[in-house]
C-alpha cells in the first residue's frame, strides 16, 4: 500500500509539474481584448497593473490561417508578440531548439515555429514559408487571398502537441501591417497572475475597472479542455488516495483478526487459569 501510494503520488506530481511548467507556462492566465484594434496599449496596461494579482503583462495580436511550403499545408495560429515583453509572461524562451525570440525584429517578417509543424512542412532555419490569411484582397483582376512570406528564424519544442504543431510567433508590428493596422496597434494584453487558479475572479475584477469596450477572458474559458484535465487530475488523486488508505486499513484489520483467532487456544487456557480479560 505504501509503495503504491508513493508511486501514484510521484506520477501525479510529475504530471502536475509538467502541466504547470510547460503548458500553463505558455498560455496567458488571462487576456484583455477589444473588438477593435487598441491604439494605446500602454495606457491600458497602466489600468490593468493596478490589480494586486497582476505580476506581468504583454501586448499581443493573434491571427489564424495556413502555412504553405513546397506544396505542403498546415493550419496555424500566429501569436504576434513583442519579444522583450513576452518574456515576462511566457517561458517559451527556454524551449528553443534553434534560434531565439530576439530574431523577431520589426520589419523582418520573421517567424518562429513549433518543431512538429516545421517537420510536417519540411522547414528548417532560414526557409521561406507563405502565410495565407483568412481574408481576401480585392483587385481589378478579382479577389485573391492575402498572402505574406515569412522567414523561419527559430524552432521550439515545448512537449505539448497542440503548441508544437499549430503555434507560430511573429513580431507584433509585422502582423499589424499584415492586417492593415497602424504599427503600434494591438489586439489586447496577455496577463500573468500570482495564482493562476484565481484567474477567473481576477479577470472579472479587472474587466469591471476598465473603461471602453474591453473584455477579459481567463484561461479556464480559452483552454477549457486543459482546465478539465487539471480538475480530473485533482479528483483522481483524491480517489486513489482514498482507495489506497481503505486497502491498507482492511489489511491491518484482517491481520489483527487472524492473530486473535490464532491465539484462541492460548486465551482459553489463560481464562481457565483465572485470568481476567483485562489481564489477557
Residues of each region from the PLM?
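Hydrophobic alpha-helical transmembrane segments of multi-pass inner-membrane transport and secretion
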Residues: 1-13, 231-268
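Internal alpha-helical transmembrane segments
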Residues: 2-4, 8-18, 22, 26, ...
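Membrane-interface junction motifs in transport/secretion proteins
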Residues: 16-46
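Amphipathic alpha-helical segments that mediate coupling or scaffolding at interfaces
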Residues: 18, 22, 155, 192, ...
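Mechanotransmission and gating elements of multispan inner-membrane complexes involved in transport
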Residues: 36, 135-138, 143-237
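Short amphipathic alpha-helices in soluble, non-transmembrane regions
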Residues: 44-49, 92, 202-209
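A structural signal for hydrophobic secondary-structure junctions
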Residues: 46-184
Amino acid at each position: 500500500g505504501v509503495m503504491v501510494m508513493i508511486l501514484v503520488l510521484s506520477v501525479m506530481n510529475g504530471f502536475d509539474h509538467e502541466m504547470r511548467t510547460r503548458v500553463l507556462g505558455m498560455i496567458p492566465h488571462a487576456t484583455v481584448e477589444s473588438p477593435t484594434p487598441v491604439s494605446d496599449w500602454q495606457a491600458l496596461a497602466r489600468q490593468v497593473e493596478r490589480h494586486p494579482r497582476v505580476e506581468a503583462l504583454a501586448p499581443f495580436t493573434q491571427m489564424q490561417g495556413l502555412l504553405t511550403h513546397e506544396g505542403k499545408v498546415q493550419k496555424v495560429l500566429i501569436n504576434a508578440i513583442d519579444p522583450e515583453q513576452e518574456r515576462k509572461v511566457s517561458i517559451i524562451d527556454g524551449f528553443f531548439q534553434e534560434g531565439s525570440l530576439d530574431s523577431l525584429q520589426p520589419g523582418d517578417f520573421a517567424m518562429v515555429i513549433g518543431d512538429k509543424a516545421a517537420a510536417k512542412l519540411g522547414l528548417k532555419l532560414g526557409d521561406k514559408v507563405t502565410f495565407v490569411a483568412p481574408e481576401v484582397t480585392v483587385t481589378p483582376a478579382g479577389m485573391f487571398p492575402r498572402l505574406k512570406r515569412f522567414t523561419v528564424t527559430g524552432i521550439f519544442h515545448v512537449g505539448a502537441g497542440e503548441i508544437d504543431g499549430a503555434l507560430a510567433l511573429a513580431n507584433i508590428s509585422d502582423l499589424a501591417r499584415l492586417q492593415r493596422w497602424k504599427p503600434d496597434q494591438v489586439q489586447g494584453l496577455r496577463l500573468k497572475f500570482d495564482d493562476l487558479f484565481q484567474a477567473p475572479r481576477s479577470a472579472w475584477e479587472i474587466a469591471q475597472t476598465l473603461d471602453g469596450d474591453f473584455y477579459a477572458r481567463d484561461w479556464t474559458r480559452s483552454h477549457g479542455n486543459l482546465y478539465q484535465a487539471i480538475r480530473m487530475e485533482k479528483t483522481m488523486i483524491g480517489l486513489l488516495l482514498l482507495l489506497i488508505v481503505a486497502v491498507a486499513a482492511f489489511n491491518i484489520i484482517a491481520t489483527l483478526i487472524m492473530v486473535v483467532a490464532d491465539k484462541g487456544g492460548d486465551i482459553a487456557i489463560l481464562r481457565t487459569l483465572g485470568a481476567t480479560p483485562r489481564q489477557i
